[in-house]
Amino acid sequence: TVLRPATVTVAIDAGATHSLDTYLSPLFYDGMHLRIGFERQRASRFNPERWTHKIEAGLTYDNPSNPAGNNSLHTIIADVDFAMLHRWRVAQGLTLHAGADIGFRGGVTYNPRNSNNVCSPLIRLYAGASGMAAYRFNAGRLPMTARWQATLPVVGGFFLPDYDQSFYEMYLGNYRNTINFGFWH
């Protein structure tokens, strides 16, 4: 029997956001960002010595305000990401991982001051590359892992309506510039 240990991480992120949603407003909004995230990484069944898979999921809440400070947006986003990573043991305690990933982000931004378009849907699908470096060490008798990771979307699709374009127009068939395809070029 081959051991397939799993690493589970729960993280709480807090910080700042600088956002622009041109469907709701032509202005940049700055403010608070909160996220709770979950990650599970485990050695794969087919080759546990060299391959791992990673699943990440999270829930984000942003509450930025406009430059005048008299209006704020409320954004809720859920995301999920799956990656298959090849693992190389470079040195004692140091491993490098590289592979492909796919992901989804979906949510809504609400602007309480707008009368016609009060919310903006956020839908993104992507595929890309992922990399990670992990170093295991002991701090006294406590085992620790320091890790750096990056995900780079390569290709994707997203829903992005134009400023002041109503959902009624889209319902009638005017999808101009609402569903977009993105890639490196």
Where are the model-predicted features located?
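Transmembrane beta-strands of outer-membrane beta-barrel pores
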Residues: 14-20, 57-65, 102-110, 135, ...
